[in-house]
Amino acid sequence: MSSTDLLKKVRKIEIKTRKLSRQIFAGEYHSAFKGRGMAFSEVREYQYGDDVRNMDWNVTARLNAPYVKVFEEEREMTVMLLVDVSGSGRFGSVSKTKRDLTAEVGAVLSFSASANNDKVGALFFSDKVEKFIPPKKGRSHLLMILRELIDFEPQSRKTDISEALRFLTNAIKKRCTAFLLSDLMDFNEDRKPKFEDALKIAAGRHDLSVINIYDKRERELPDIGMLRVSDAETGGEMWIDTSSRRVREEYAKWSEDVNIAVRQTLRKYKVDSADISTDSDYVKGLITLFKSR
């Protein structure tokens, strides 16, 4: 993509996602993702209805009048995006690819976090950590993340989600809010996710949510006869007879088994998640995720 085309795309997505983050997600995001807790703000005279547990007895005794401590929510958080940039993200059977969708979802999350005065960072991964952008504030910083979301070129096409989760655990010491944006195509021959151990540790240390980005053709095959399919991560190719009901049913069963295993793993470690497809309205998916928390 030329620099001119990239700038146009960045600007287009910025306008769209910034508007969404202001008009739709601001309140939902604030409610869903809390700050680190309550911080002391000031002492003032007691008013009817104040919680007596917040009485400041030292000041009360000194001034011979009831005073209470006032606390405010520590709103500022660190938000990390863990972005899967492996080869499978280039697939899309409709107007946009999974990488296109990931860029928009990542942008909405970034601008929503920024609107709440949170720092935002990003980690781009394949089967290794390809790039780490430490969390910061500011429009120029957000636009840098957005450019990478749109146009980052990884060195590897393969996937290892555990690498990203381990890096998050080791690099971000304080508890943060983290979003894993991936198609989650990282499983064993028994169709179980390879990243369970790393997920368990990361979810115990950070507030982790998973956004499963997928295309409908990865879950069901169309009935269109012979179809050549390729693995974007290995380069392997094969022909499939999609006119065969048995082939289509076996493929759907395989896909469902993988998704069930992923959902069970996420529930096991109390990780919130959303499934968002390239042909659906991601706004609804994100709002559902926020409201479920």
Regions found by a protein language model. Give the residues of each.
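Well-ordered alpha-helical segments embedded in enzymatic catalytic cores
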Residues: 105, 163-167, 258
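Short amphipathic alpha-helical interaction patches enriched in hydrophobic/aromatic residues
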Residues: 89, 93, 149-153, 270-273
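A generic local structural motif
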Residues: 66-68, 164-167, 195-197
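Short, electropositive alpha-helical surface patch
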Residues: 133-147, 291-292
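An amphipathic, basic-hydrophobic helix/alpha-beta surface used to engage anionic
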Residues: 1-137, 177, 181-182, 189, ...
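A conditional alpha-helix N-cap/helix-loop micro-motif detector
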Residues: 103, 157-161, 191-192, 255
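Von Willebrand factor
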Residues: 141-176, 189, 215-216
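Von Willebrand factor type A / integrin I
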Residues: 1-33, 42, 51, 170-174, ...
